[in-house]
């Protein structure tokens, strides 16, 4: 009877959101009914992205009870996120870009049901606008330098543009491409904005130390420090090897290394990858009572066939050291080989000494449609160590599983849509699920 009531509750909550979902899809289809493209005026390029989405997270916890699923409260909402950019022409190899962005719900959402949506700041919980990008770039065939605010992509500090609004960073970087197939990078991240991945108010730019996931006392000790980084990336389309090092001053160092062997043709292709990530405390944090000292070893095998079928597999082992809750997902980095589609790892008590496994199957309808349509089914399993991972009421946890279904669709000129549903089971907590319907158009 309890299971039956649970299923009825799920369907009731889904039904309660149907009007909002219908509104979302109506706006999306209206926007996509006309193909759009960037506008060029005397070398100045105007472009943009209008994104809209319905997100819903059911933790079986409508009142935010701290003894259920870490106190995470059921949340849902509809949002629209416009973004517009102006890129200058190149003058003596110099160019610049400015991007304005924002997010609003037009007052349609229930503020009491938005705490886990992470589109608005969870404390202020209101619409916002932001100067997302403003940078100057110098680029030649072998050199590139950039300073300013930019949606920048690296493995462990990333724009992470898979949700409603990407992360952006106040930064500087130099990239040398003198050697064939090789990129040598060095730079500094000073600040970050991004609601989903920031440990501070993500609707504004904050120092990298404030935007980290370490305890507030460690942030205060770091005193608005940034992150230095350097990288070597070699890629000849068969062998792709990369090593990145990130030094978060007074907090912790992150070493990321990955190798992929990639082969294939129109009938069959595959990617065999190995990854190593190490987190180690430095500076003032090293002398504090916060521990960050662990590594992750991972393998993957991904393959695709000419008939549209694909598989993606991964396995990861977390060593027996502390700090996973203070580092995983910080600053937008999600390069991990064995994650879920939505939930990833935040609902586990701890991933210390854990192991994870992923199996995904997909189908690309490229032979049936001129548009790009794909459907993917993923199952992720975490074997937890009950010595470290505990439920909200203190019980040890052995197992966390996630099963997700995702549909991706790109159509017309710039239209896109991603729908994702994932169910989440963990020992000694109620079953949870999440739904994301996100789409829009670029121009």
Description of each model-found segment:
Residues 1-42:
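Cleavable N-terminal export/targeting peptides
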Residues 27-152, 172-178, 182, 264-266, ...:
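Beta-barrel outer-membrane channel/assembly domains of diderm bacteria
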Residues 52-54, 145-159, 184-186, 230, ...:
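Transmembrane beta-strand segments that form the barrel wall of outer-membrane beta-barrel proteins
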Residues 53-62, 103-109, 150-160, 191-195, ...:
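Sequence/structural signature of outer-membrane beta-barrel proteins
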Residues 66-72, 119-122, 157-160, 215-218, ...:
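Extracellular loop and loop/strand-boundary signature of outer-membrane beta-barrel proteins
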Residues 76-80, 128-132, 165-170, 224-228, ...:
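Residues that define the transmembrane beta-barrel architecture of outer-membrane proteins
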Residues 182-227, 268-348, 352, 421-435:
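Outer-membrane beta-barrel translocator/channel fold
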Residues 315-392, 401-402:
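C-terminal structural cap/anchor segments
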């Amino acid at each position: 009877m309890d299971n039956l009531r649970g299923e009825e509750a799920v369907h009731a909550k889904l039904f309660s959101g149907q009007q909002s979902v219908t509104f979302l899809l109506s706006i999306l289809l209206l926007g996509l009914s006309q193909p759009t493209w960037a506008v060029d005026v005397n070398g100045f390029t105007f472009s943009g992205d209008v994104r809209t989405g319905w997100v819903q997270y059911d933790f079986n916890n409508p009142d935010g009870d701290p003894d259920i699923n870490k106190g995470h409260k059921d949340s849902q909402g509809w949002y629209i996120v416009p973004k517009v950019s102006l890129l200058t022409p190149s003058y003596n190899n110099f160019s610049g870009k400015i991007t304005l962005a924002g997010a609003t719900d037009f007052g349609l959402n229930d503020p009491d049901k938005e705490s886990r949506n992470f589109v608005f700041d969870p404390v202020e919980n209101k619409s916002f606008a932001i100067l997302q990008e403003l940078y100057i770039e110098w680029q030649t065939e072998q050199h590139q330098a950039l300073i300013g605010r930019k949606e920048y992509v690296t493995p462990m500090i990333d724009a992470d543009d898979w949700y409603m609004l990407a992360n952006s960073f106040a930064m500087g970087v130099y990239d040398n491409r003198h050697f064939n197939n090789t990129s040598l990078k060095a730079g500094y991240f000073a600040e970050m904005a991004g609601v989903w991945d920031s440990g501070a108010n993500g609707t504004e730019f904050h120092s990298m130390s404030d935007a980290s996931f370490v305890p507030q006392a460690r942030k205060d000790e770091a005193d608005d420090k940034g992150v230095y980084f350097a990288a070597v990336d070699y890629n000849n389309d068969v062998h792709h090897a990369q090593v990145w090092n990130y030094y978060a001053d007074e907090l912790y160092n992150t070493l990321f290394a990955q190798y992929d062997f990639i082969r294939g043709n129109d009938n069959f292709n595959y990617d065999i990858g190995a990854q190593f990530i190490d987190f180690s405390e430095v500076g003032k944090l090293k002398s504090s009572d916060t521990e960050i000292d662990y590594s992750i070893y991972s393998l993957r095998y991904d393959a695709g066939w000419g008939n549209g079928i694909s598989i993606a597999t991964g396995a990861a082992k977390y060593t027996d050291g502390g700090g996973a809750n203070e580092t995983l997902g910080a600053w937008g980095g999600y390069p991990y080989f064995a994650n879920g589609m939505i939930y990833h790892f935040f609902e586990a008590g701890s991933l210390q000494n854990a192991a994870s496994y992923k199996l995904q199957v997909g189908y690309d309808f490229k032979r049936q449609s001129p548009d790009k349509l794909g459907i993917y089914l993923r199952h992720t399993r975490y074997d937890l160590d009950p010595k470290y991972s505990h439920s909200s009421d203190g019980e040890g946890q052995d197992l966390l599983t996630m099963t997700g279904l995702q549909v991706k669709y790109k159509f017309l000129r710039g239209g896109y849509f991603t729908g994702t549903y994932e169910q989440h089971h963990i020992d000694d907590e109620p079953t949870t699920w999440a739904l994301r319907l996100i789409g829009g158009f670029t121009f």
